[in-house]
Regions:
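Active-site SXXK
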Residues: 58-59, 72-94, 216, 283
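Active-site-adjacent helix/loop patches that line small-molecule binding or acyl-intermediate pockets
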Residues: 7-31, 87-200
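A short, well-structured edge-of-sheet supersecondary motif
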Residues: 27-64, 272-275
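Non-catalytic interaction/Regulatory regions outside core domains
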Residues: 7, 11-15, 35-46, 72-80, ...
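Penicillin-binding protein/beta-lactamase superfamily catalytic region
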Residues: 140, 170, 179-240, 293-296
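Structured C-terminal helix/loop/strand segments within mature extracytoplasmic catalytic/sensor domains
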Residues: 23, 223-315
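Short Gly/Pro-enriched turn/cap motifs at secondary-structure boundaries
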Residues: 42-45, 120-121, 171, 262-266
Length: 315
């Protein structure tokens, strides 16, 4: 049954002109920050790249620069993971992972220990590791089924895991291994720790372009039924995932993003950011240079200017 949403008319908004203006105005930030170097495979990425793509619910696409260049989406993939888990487990998923902002670093152990192994939300590392464990239980062929879901979202069957990145993360992912062991200690993981970690790292290693991400996240704008490769969500569930993105999607900088941009979204240490304007558009931006909180400097500024110049946010 088709969800009854009115599709907003974006014909009177010159998004391409706005994107070009934004690109000119963020140039002073082009040499600030650096790419993630604690993941060796990501440290090799040319930091002087930038792409942006905006896809509207009425079928228009606006992009510039490196919008077709694929990169490691890292934590952006956690939105896909929790969507799949919510489809498969329903509201029971929230017994295993919370919906609250963490207020701490995305790889913090302290809060997890204090709260007996129940992660604050599905977008910090501990929460995403729990979700990966659940998907290992619920999917018949976890790796194949999950990537099929992502491919269905973006409409491109060539999207895939990057095994070099996943292996690199596992080799040096000591803190994530500590998180997984703490989760296991508290009885929050059912599967073998190594199996969970490798699946988690593979999920994070998925490579997509801004163009593919903006198309994939149109599914979360609520303009049509959410049904992709056997993963189905109703309109209420999609809205609630947007709410969690709004409050928890940017590590311990979620409040700043809400204040400056005013859209639900998710970032990743690969330099990507995706944001959603429900019923209107989704937008993906990529620039590998990060701020100390792990978010793309040029990406954050670009999205701040986007909602400023369009005068469109959810508030």
């Amino acid at each position: 049954m088709l969800l009854k949403f009115a599709i907003s008319n974006t014909d009177d908004m010159n998004y391409q002109e706005i994107l070009e203006r934004i690109y000119r105005e963020i140039q002073p930030y082009s040499q600030k920050g650096k790419q993630a170097d604690y993941i060796p495979a990501l440290s090799k990425v040319n930091p002087n790249q930038f792409g942006i793509c905006l896809s509207t619910t009425d079928g228009q696409t606006y992009s510039l620069k490196d919008s077709e260049k694929r990169f490691s989406i890292q934590s952006i993939s956690k939105v896909f993971a929790i969507a799949a888990a919510l489809s498969l487990k329903g509201e029971n998923i929230w017994r295993h992972v919370g919906k609250e902002p963490s207020g701490t670093a995305f790889n913090s152990l302290f809060q997890l220990e204090l709260e007996k192994g129940i992660p604050r939300n599905p977008f910090i590392n501990s929460g995403a590791i729990v979700v990966a464990d659940i998907l290992l239980n619920e999917l018949k062929d976890p790796e194949a089924d999950f990537i099929s879901f992502v491919r269905a979202l973006c409409g491109n069957d060539s999207v895939d895991y990057n095994l070099e990145v996943a292996t690199s993360e596992r080799q040096y992912g000591y803190l994530n291994a500590a998180i997984a062991n703490l989760l296991k200690y508290h009885g929050c993981l059912r599967n073998d720790i190594e199996d969970v970690l490798m699946f988690y790292f593979k999920i994070c290693s998925i490579e997509m372009s801004c163009s593919e991400l903006s198309k994939a996240f149109l599914a979360f704008t609520g303009y049509k039924d959410f049904s992709y490769a056997g993963i189905n969500l109703n309109s209420s569930q999609v809205k609630r995932l947007n709410a969690v993105m709004q409050t928890c999607g940017f590590y311990d900088e979620a409040g700043e993003f809400s204040y400056l941009v005013g859209l639900p979204g998710k970032s990743g240490v690969g330099g990507g950011i995706v944001a959603i304007h429900p019923l209107k558009y989704s937008v993906a931006v990529w620039s590998p240079r990060l701020n100390p909180k792990g978010n793309s400097i040029m990406g954050m500024k670009a999205l701040e200017l986007l909602t400023t110049y369009t005068a469109e946010s959810i508030f």
